[in-house]
Amino acid sequence: MGTKQEHFFLQHVQDLYHRTIYNDYPSFTEFLTTGEMSALLQNQKMFPSVVLRMWGGHKDCDSKMAGFFPADFVDAYDQAFPICCIRISPVHEKYADTLIHRDYLGAVLNLGISRSTIGDIRICEKAAYLFCVEELKEFILSNLRQVKHTIMECREISELDEIPERQYEIHRQTVASARLDNIVAAMIRARRQTN
């Protein structure tokens, strides 16, 4: 994150911090990039007398919002965040294309939605779970009808237990030496190039 961008971001976050102090009510950022999360955590001392929390809608989300809470805030922090989850699934699974993250993200951004209002998109077989800011829920539910060539239906998920856990794959490779370029090349199944 460039110093100028970081400066503007931290000014915006300072405004949210002051809003929380003066209104005695939580304030939230939009979904943050990795650089913004890092800058915020490095400058956490700038925000005394409030509780800073980050949440993305589910326990293992990568994209998160930052929330500034008054010190005497008693509600559950994660439930206070203005995040909702939308399940996007094909109307007719039999005729559905095989879709990847890029397809879902492209369909959502094609609606004119800013990337900072969209959190993680979790793909599970033929469906996807989209985390977004609460104020976009109705817009997405009524306007997202198609991803690639597949007709979709959307519904809000209120129980987070319905969202599948993140799946990981274990790959075993043998490398000639434990150098980073050999390990990365083995992971992406590429050969090392010599010039």
Model-derived regions: residue spans:
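Ferredoxin-like alpha/beta domains used as RNA- or RNAP-binding modules
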Residues: 1-187
